[in-house]
């Protein structure tokens, strides 16, 4: 055992859509991206994935394990899906969470993909 986390897993939009409400979702975008007030011109819809908790990646990387558990309501070993706008910030979050013992998965398509799928719900 080297202490280096295994490469992080990914989740496809289809699986995430089916599992909404079952698996915790973490949005690591800024608050204004999360609430839709940032108004990203490349996204046809603004907001976030239903039920997602928002912890900006810049804050997440500064939190300790206890603070993350409190903010997310999770314990090590629990599954969680992270997303952002295009999958890069959520990749960092996924690695960080996996390093702390969570079963974290990255939704690579992130909001850029989700916002384009009219059949998918948003808040």
Enumerate the language-model features and the residues they cover.
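Rhodanese-like catalytic fold shared by cysteine-dependent sulfurtransferases
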Residues: 1-24, 28-81, 85-123
């Amino acid at each position: 055992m080297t202490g280096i986390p295994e490469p992080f897993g990914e989740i496809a939009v289809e699986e995430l859509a089916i599992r909404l409400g079952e698996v915790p979702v973490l949005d690591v975008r800024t608050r204004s991206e999360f609430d839709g007030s940032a108004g990203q011109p490349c996204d046809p819809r603004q907001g976030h994935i239903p039920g997602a908790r928002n912890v900006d990646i810049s804050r997440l990387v500064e939190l300790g394990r206890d603070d993350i558990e409190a903010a997310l309501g999770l314990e090590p070993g629990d599954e969680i899906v992270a997303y952002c706008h295009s999958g890069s910030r959520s990749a960092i979050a996924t690695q960080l969470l996996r390093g702390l013992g969570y079963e974290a998965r990255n939704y690579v398509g992130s909001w850029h993909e989700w916002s384009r799928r009219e059949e998918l719900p948003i808040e």
